């Protein structure tokens, strides 16, 4: 009967440590793109909803990832990633 191979790959860091490092990176990036008062409000909402739990950590990671993705997708002034909306020239050559 076939058996799954033994895990002989490199040792992975614990999930909790990885999640906290990821959250720290996301927070550092988020403060560069969003007002601190918004981020503080988000943190308060997560804390009131989940308390000091891993579910709260996972929720804020997910929300920050989504916010940053959408922010970059729309077009961040600090980044070359995203859709850059160009304004139409108003030189009298518009449609009538």
Curated annotation (Swiss-Prot):
Organism superkingdom: Viruses
Protein name: Protein Vpr
Main subcellular localisation: virion
Keywords associated with the record: Activator, AIDS, Apoptosis, Cell cycle, Host G2/M cell cycle arrest by virus, Host nucleus, Host-virus interaction, Ion channel, Ion transport, Modulation of host cell cycle by virus, Phosphoprotein, Transcription, Transcription regulation, Transport, Viral penetration into host nucleus, Virion, Virus entry into host cell
Complexes and interactors: Homooligomer, may form homodimer. Interacts with p6-gag region of the Pr55 Gag precursor protein through a (Leu-X-X)4 motif near the C-terminus of the P6gag protein. Interacts with host UNG. May interact with host RAD23A/HHR23A. Interacts with host VPRBP/DCAF1, leading to hijack the CUL4A-RBX1-DDB1-DCAF1/VPRBP complex, mediating ubiquitination of host proteins such as TERT and ZGPAT and arrest of the cell cycle in G2 phase.
Organism the protein comes from: Human immunodeficiency virus type 1 group M subtype B (isolate MN)
Gene from which the chain derives: vpr
PTM statement from Swiss-Prot or TrEMBL: Phosphorylated on several residues by host. These phosphorylations regulate VPR activity for the nuclear import of the HIV-1 pre-integration complex.
Further comment found in the protein's record: HIV-1 lineages are divided in three main groups, M (for Major), O (for Outlier), and N (for New, or Non-M, Non-O). The vast majority of strains found worldwide belong to the group M. Group O seems to be endemic to and largely confined to Cameroon and neighboring countries in West Central Africa, where these viruses represent a small minority of HIV-1 strains. The group N is represented by a limited number of isolates from Cameroonian persons. The group M is further subdivided in 9 clades or subtypes (A to D, F to H, J and K).
